């Protein structure tokens, strides 16, 4: 199936400004994520409002878009410029993303129009608001939240979309919970779009804060 990877990235991160350019073992974060995604041999594009990121990745591999409310909306804008049936959205803070995870998400798009991934969550992460929890029944997602404690699995920042559903994202109703939780994926759930889920193996670090960056460096 005609599939491309989109990596939404911006410099104006609230918790960690210029995070995308922060170096991990001498390589900028967004470059490292891009390199990992390219290992799949799927066409890969960084989607960004920032010329600095375009200059780093190269104009042939980046799509410059205007203002967007979140990463999914950014990907929806980018989908207008390139012609693919399916898209995989990999967050720009995942330097340890693997080909296996991307392939697992892509495969499930044969069944669902929107897909995401999760991994089992350790007890210490369950009380951490930076760790997004997913409630699911093993087949589809039922809810996402940061403040959930004591149950749920760890939601990974990767999604799969069929082209038509991604294009429709901006037309879906936005509910208060999306704003409160700061979780754009709630829009699918609250508009009754079935989101397929797949359990994956992931032992890496997602770079949300400078502390995460330091933790990653120590593991190298």
Question: Residues of each region from the PLM?
Answer:
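N-terminal glycine-rich phosphate-binding loop and ensuing alpha1 helix
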Residues: 2-48
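Conserved core of the sugar-phosphate nucleotidyltransferase
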Residues: 97-175
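Conserved alpha/beta core of the MobA/IspD/sugar-nucleotide pyrophosphorylase nucleotidyltransferase superfamily
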Residues: 152-220
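Short, high-confidence coil segments that cap the C-terminus of an alpha-helix
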Residues: 41, 84, 110-114, 193
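Catalytic phosphate/metal-binding cores of nucleic-acid and nucleotide-processing enzymes, i.e., regions
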Residues: 1-4, 82-83, 109
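Short phosphate-binding loop-to-helix
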Residues: 51-107
């Amino acid at each position: 199936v005609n599939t491309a990877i989109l990596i939404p990235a911006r410099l104006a991160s609230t918790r960690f400004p210029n995070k995308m350019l922060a170096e991990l073992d001498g390589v900028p974060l967004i470059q490292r994520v891009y390199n990992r995604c390219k290992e799949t041999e799927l066409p890969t594009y960084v989607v960004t409002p920032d010329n600095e990121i375009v200059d780093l990745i190269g104009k042939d591999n980046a799509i410059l878009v205007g203002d967007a409310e979140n990463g999914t909306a950014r990907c929806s804008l980018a989908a207008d410029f390139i012609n693919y049936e399916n898209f995989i959205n990999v967050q720009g803070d995942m330097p340890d993303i693997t080909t296996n995870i991307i392939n697992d998400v892509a495969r499930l798009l044969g069944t669902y129009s929107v897909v995401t991934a999760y991994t089992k969550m350790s007890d210490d992460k369950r009380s951490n608001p930076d760790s997004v929890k997913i409630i699911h029944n093993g087949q589809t997602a039922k809810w996402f939240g940061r403040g959930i404690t004591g149950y749920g699995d760890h939601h990974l920042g990767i999604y799969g979309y069929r082209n038509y559903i991604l294009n429709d994202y901006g037309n879906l109703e936005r509910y208060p919970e999306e704003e409160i939780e700061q979780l754009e994926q709630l829009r699918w759930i609250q508009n009754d779009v079935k989101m397929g889920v797949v359990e994956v193996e992931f032992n890496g670090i997602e770079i949300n804060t400078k502390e995460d960056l330091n933790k990653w460096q120590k593991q190298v």
